[in-house]
């Protein structure tokens, strides 16, 4: 599988300079998907979640960053992929948050999962693809994916 190389990006300071960190992505792909497909999917998720604004705080303060990551989601991802490291607050950094999302989905998505299944897991948790309430979310992500064609 080819590697996706992205430049190093410094996260914006959140409350104080101690939150300023850098992350380098050397490899980023969802299991069974190419890196280009993964990149497009992540862009669609980010657009739906936050309008691609990485500094958003939502869900009454429970979700942060462009992917609207909850602390429990982040913890599941870093427990699965210990190379992620960092702090929850690093989810304001797009590249870091992408690693978190990929790890979470690789942890919980069944082998060969469709884009729909992946989007619904992101939105509704490990069994989110079985929850009727995540169907509307998938339709939004699907529209974003279609714009990229």
What are these regions (language model features)?
Residues 1-40, 146-149:
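N-terminal secretory targeting signals
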Residues 21, 41-46, 96-98:
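Short linear motifs at secondary-structure transitions and domain/linker junctions
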Residues 28, 51, 84-85:
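Short, flexible active-site loops
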Residues 31-39, 59-63, 67, 90-98, ...:
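Solvent-exposed, acidic/flexible segments
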Residues 36-53, 69, 117-126:
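Short, functionally critical alpha-helical segments immediately adjacent to catalytic or ligand/cofactor-binding
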Residues 53-57, 76-79:
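Short, solvent-exposed loop/turn elements at domain surfaces
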Residues 54-55, 128-132:
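A generic structural signal for short coil/turn motifs at secondary-structure boundaries
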Residues 71-129, 138-148:
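Alpha-helical segment that forms one wall of the substrate-binding/catalytic cleft
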């Amino acid at each position: 599988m080819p590697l996706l190389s992205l430049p190093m990006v410094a996260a914006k300071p959140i409350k104080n300079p101690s939150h300023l960190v850098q992350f380098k992505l050397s490899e980023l792909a969802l299991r069974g998907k190419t890196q280009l497909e993964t990149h497009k999917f992540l862009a669609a998720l980010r657009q739906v979640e936050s309008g691609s604004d990485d500094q958003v705080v939502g869900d009454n303060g429970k979700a942060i960053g462009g992917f609207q990551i909850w602390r429990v989601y982040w913890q599941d991802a870093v427990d699965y992929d210990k190379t992620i490291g960092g702090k929850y607050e690093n989810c304001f950094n797009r590249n870091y948050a992408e690693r978190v999302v990929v790890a979470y989905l690789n942890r919980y998505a069944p082998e060969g999962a469709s884009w729909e299944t992946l989007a619904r897991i992101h939105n509704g948790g490990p069994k989110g693809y079985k929850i009727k309430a995540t169907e509307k979310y998938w339709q939004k992500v699907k529209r974003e994916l279609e714009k990229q064609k």
